[in-house]
Structure formats: structure tokens, C-alpha cells
């Protein structure tokens, strides 16, 4: 539990932008289709 933040913080720092980019990409693709 002591090392949890040192693993959790970089993980969120990488996963959150990846999800944001993926959702933005899908949103743009959906707008292009329709």
C-alpha cells in the first residue's frame, strides 16, 4: 500500500489522456460518418 501512489499516479497520467484521445477520435469519426 505504501508504493501504491507511485504506481497509481503515472498509470492515471498515461491512461486518462489515452481515453481522452480515444473518445475524441471516435467523436470525430462519428461526425465524419454522419
UniProtKB/Swiss-Prot annotation:
<feature type="transmembrane region" description="Helical">
    <location>
        <begin position="8"/>
        <end position="28"/>
    </location>
</feature>
<keyword id="KW-0934">Plastid</keyword>
<protein>
    <recommendedName>
        <fullName>Photosystem I reaction center subunit VIII</fullName>
    </recommendedName>
</protein>
<dbReference type="GO" id="GO:0009535">
    <property type="term" value="C:chloroplast thylakoid membrane"/>
</dbReference>
<keyword id="KW-0603">Photosystem I</keyword>
<keyword id="KW-0472">Membrane</keyword>
<keyword id="KW-0150">Chloroplast</keyword>
<dbReference type="GO" id="GO:0009522">
    <property type="term" value="C:photosystem I"/>
</dbReference>
<dbReference type="InterPro" id="IPR036357">
    <property type="entry name" value="PSI_PsaI_sf"/>
</dbReference>
<comment type="similarity">
    <text>Belongs to the PsaI family.</text>
</comment>
<dbReference type="Pfam" id="PF00796">
    <property type="entry name" value="PSI_8"/>
</dbReference>
<keyword id="KW-1133">Transmembrane helix</keyword>
<dbReference type="InterPro" id="IPR001302">
    <property type="entry name" value="PSI_PsaI"/>
</dbReference>
<comment type="function">
    <text>May help in the organization of the PsaL subunit.</text>
</comment>
<dbReference type="GO" id="GO:0015979">
    <property type="term" value="P:photosynthesis"/>
</dbReference>
<keyword id="KW-0793">Thylakoid</keyword>
<keyword id="KW-0602">Photosynthesis</keyword>
<keyword id="KW-0812">Transmembrane</keyword>
